[in-house]
Design a protein with these regions (language model features):
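Structured aminoacyl-transfer and RNA-binding surfaces used for tRNA recognition/handling
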Residues: 1-233
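Short, intrinsically disordered, charge-balanced linker/junction segments flanking boundaries
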Residues: 236-237
Length: 237
């Protein structure tokens, strides 16, 4: 908890008044995560109004129906001019304004051996921490969409140029297709750099499907010539 807070507020220098913490409120047979809440209060100086308690759906993480699991604690950032805690829990607006999760700390302390079975304490509990790198980049760069960060926006704009269209950052069919092409071109470049080629089996088939979907969305944009290699080359550059 202290490491996460130190990184976000001192290294990245995010304003603390735009951050809110969530912890597990407890459920039947599972205690509330009072320990995490107490540590957050000590580390941040926040009161209860900025350390929110949520249930299983939001603040209890598991790998699936079985396996390691445990309560989690999330850090959320507010996109917009006036951080409004009363809006917490709402989906961000179409323009991206609102609260968005940027960090999750999972306290792995239980194991579920069978689907629907009881939870047993893990002999060696651990902490699984996950931060959304592109979400954090969006926060730092002052944009509300991952596709508007410098690494992806250039690919989106290149796709728009090839298609002879304008990217507006909306949820229109054209803009969605441009984002798909940008994302999938990057995936294609990264996989091929690792030696994966489009084939008919295993991970090679996954790459083939990714490329096929990118090309399909290019066709939806009216692109009738080969184009995916151009966007992938920009990733390499």
């Amino acid at each position: 908890i202290a490491f996460a807070w130190d990184y976000l507020t001192k290294v990245v220098e995010l304003p603390q008044d735009r951050l809110v913490i969530t912890v597990f409120e407890g459920a039947e047979g599972l205690p509330a995560d009072d320990e995490a809440a107490a540590i957050w209060k000590k580390v941040t100086g926040f009161g209860d109004e900025r350390i929110l308690r949520l249930g299983m759906a939001d603040n209890f993480w598991s790998m699936g129906d079985t396996g390691p699991c445990g309560p989690c604690s999330e850090i959320h950032f507010f996109h917009g001019n006036d951080p409004d805690i009363s809006r917490f829990g709402e989906e961000p607006r179409i323009d991206g304004l609102g609260w968005t999760e940027i960090w999750n700390l999972v306290f792995m302390q239980y194991d579920r051996a069978e689907k629907g079975g009881s939870l047993e304490a893990l002999p060696a509990p651990s902490i699984d921490t996950g931060m959304g790198l592109e979400r954090l980049a969006a926060v730092v760069q002052g944009v509300t969409s991952n596709y508007d960060i410098d690494l992806l926006r250039e690919l989106v704009e290149l796709t728009a140029t090839i298609a002879g269209k304008k990217y507006t950052g909306s949820t229109s069919d054209d803009d969605v297709s441009m984002r798909v092409v940008a994302d999938h071109a990057r995936t294609t470049a990264m996989l091929m750099a690792e030696g994966v080629m489009p084939e008919k089996q295993k991970r090679e088939y996954v790459l083939r499907r990714v490329m096929r979907r990118a090309i399909r969305h290019g066709h939806r944009l009216g692109i009738e010539r080969p184009f995916l290699h151009e966007v992938a080359l920009r990733v390499v550059e």
